[in-house]
Design a protein with these regions (language model features):
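Charged, E/D/K/R/S-rich low-complexity terminal regions of large eukaryotic assembly subunits
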Residues: 1-22, 26-219
Length: 219
């Protein structure tokens, strides 16, 4: 199976290929076939203009083939960089993008895609009660120019990656929801830190209430 490049229907290829893999035993495929399918699936996911969540592919064992490849392990790394909105990792891997014909042809789209990923990651890292983000903050976290921030947010809202509203006067985005996604170990570590910070805050509040209220409580 090859990517139907003439039709540029990468999303359809991606979904069809994953459905096919769900119906077969990977052990029945040759190493070459597994590698080819993992490669094409990864490229299709990246260049598609409608796929922004790679969770199903990241969890699929066929992707392990790329991790074992000296030539194409970077492609797996690139998928995970997109998943966590890692701009630094994207820049490190940019040489591989320019050397790959299909990815290079979609380089502008890929850059916009990583900016969107950086935006959703920035929102995800913040607690639900602290998701009113100024355009300046978003610009700093996504490396997008200030004059392009409103368009970036509107794009994320239109794609269903975020939900919320934009205050154009004060230049603030009020985000109420961010699309769930698969977390890698670095993201799990960040989530653990947030939970520990929250637990510490709750304990401090409990100690303060206990000290301030002493034995007098009103119901």
């Amino acid at each position: 199976m090859i990517i139907p490049q003439r039709k540029m229907d990468f999303a359809n290829y991606y979904r069809t290929a994953l459905l096919y893999l769900a119906c077969i035993d990977l052990a029945s495929m040759s190493d070459e076939e597994r590698h080819r399918r993992a490669y094409y699936l990864s490229v299709a996911a990246l260049v598609s203009n409608s796929i922004y969540n790679f969770g199903e592919l990241l969890l699929h064992p066929i992707l392990d083939v790329l991790a074992q490849s000296e030539d194409d392990s970077w492609l797996r790394d690139l998928l995970f960089a997109f998943n966590r909105g890692d701009l630094a990792a994207y820049d490190v891997l940019s040489d591989h993008i320019s050397e790959n014909r299909l990815l290079n042809e979609h380089s502008t789209h890929l850059r916009q895609k990583i900016y969107l990923a950086a935006l959703t990651e920035a929102v995800f890292r913040r607690p639900p009660h602290d998701r009113a983000m100024t355009f300046t903050t978003i610009s700093q976290e996504t490396k997008v120019r200030p004059e392009e921030i409103e368009h970036l947010i509107m794009k994320a809202l239109s794609l269903g990656l975020l939900r919320g509203t934009i205050d154009q006067v004060d230049e603030v985005a009020h985000i109420t929801w961010v699309q769930p996604k698969v977390l890698d170990m670095k993201q799990v570590g960040n989530l653990r830190k947030r939970l520990l910070d929250w637990d510490s805050s709750v304990n401090q509040l409990g100690n303060w209430i206990e000290g301030a209220g002493k034995d007098v409580w009103a119901a």
